[in-house]
Amino acid sequence: MIVLILVFRLVIGEQMIDVLGPEKRRRRTTQEKIAIVQQSFEPGMTVSLVARQHGVAASQLFLWRKQYQEGSLTAVAAGEQVVPASELAAAMKQIKELQRLLGKKTMENELLKEAVEYGRAKKWIAHAPLIARGWGVSLVSRCLRVSRAQLHVILRRTDDWMDGRRSRHTDDTDVLLRIHHVIGELPTYGYRRVWALLRRQAELDGMPAINAKRVYRIMRQNALLLERKPAVPPSKRAHTGRVAVKESNQRWCSDGFEFCCDNGERLRVTFALDCCDREALHWAVTTGGFNSETVQDVMLGAVERRFGNDLPSSPVEWLTDNGSCYRANETRQFARMLGLEPKNTAVRSPESNGIAESFVKTIKRDYISIMPKPDGLTAAKNLAEAFEHYNEWHPHSALGYRSPREYLRHGACNGLSDNRCLEI
């Protein structure tokens, strides 16, 4: 038991009396504490005044007021800190929300477990079984990430409904025969160039053109597709320029290559291309080396091919690499006499003459690799047919998969520029 010595000073009239004696500590109930606190909120009352009236320390009464304002009546009775009612309500609300989310995710998890049994092929296959087993449409659409409106359409279809996209059964026999005919003559052609040749033949016959995707599907089903090309590592040297131009007779490019005949004889070919329509303007083949005279012959043949006996009205760029036959003074002087402006690529930059480099790869892959070349004379004759086939029939991706001369005729018949013809 705690014994307190209380000192009271009573003022009676003008005499002051000190009262000294033992006094027990008074324990107040919760109701008494609340009454004292409420009295401190009355008008004209202060914490200090009410505390003196009831013999309570002002700090203790201030603590009771704080606990009372926070709604912690239990704290007033127990004399210890508890969570305020506002925080308790927020915590209870959060607990209810977490319980709702937990139940929602549990249902979604159960739905997805059942959907795995049905939806290994396509998601729409799992719709009907799941909804038939009692799952809601909204829950199914949200879990499977499909359109809710489309689910409603599927559920309301009649029993005799048929998918019009799958009701057409086309006969691919004739198309397959034509594909075999094309790749029989040109085995290095992929489905895009096969489609281009079939499209051209259909235009000549006045028949509807075949879709490229259909050609791809037929060739894939019959194992006629070419092997995918291996990924080429990117070059460390960035090439930001553009070799191709939008109009013909603005820039020509030239390069050379060689190949070996079956008897060991080597032929060296020099050619010139237009950097817009990709037509092989002129070419020359020899068993000797690449020299200035051969390049001059190719220059003259290219000018005669495009301008006849006249010279170009404006200079045409003559783009080549840094070979000695192209940098010779005689070659450059002769080029300027013909109205050509010699341009050389940067050192060790084959990309700067990429059109000519690509042409070399095309000729070697699609023609030289499959044509008979027992000796130099036979190879030269077959090479002439290869250049003619390239100009007249070989589809080029940059020309909308049309051949160079087909591209030129298409633009001339429609009265369009080369740039607009390419868009068509």
Swiss-Prot record:
PROSITE patterns found in the cross-reference section: INTEGRASE
GO molecular function, one term: transposase activity
InterPro entries from the UniProt entry: Homeodomain-like_sf (IPR009057), HTH-like_dom (IPR025948), Integrase_cat-core (IPR001584), RNaseH-like_sf (IPR012337), RNaseH_sf (IPR036397), Transpos_IS3 (IPR048020), Transposase_8 (IPR002514)
Keyword Transcription: no
Residues annotated as domain Integrase catalytic: 229-412
Keywords noted in UniProt: Transposable element
PANTHER family documented for this protein: TRANSPOSASE INSC FOR INSERTION ELEMENT IS2A-RELATED
Protein family according to the UniProt entry: Belongs to the transposase 8 family.
Protein name (Swiss-Prot/TrEMBL): Insertion element IS2A uncharacterized 48.2 kDa protein
Lineage: Bacteria, Pseudomonadati, Pseudomonadota, Gammaproteobacteria, Enterobacterales
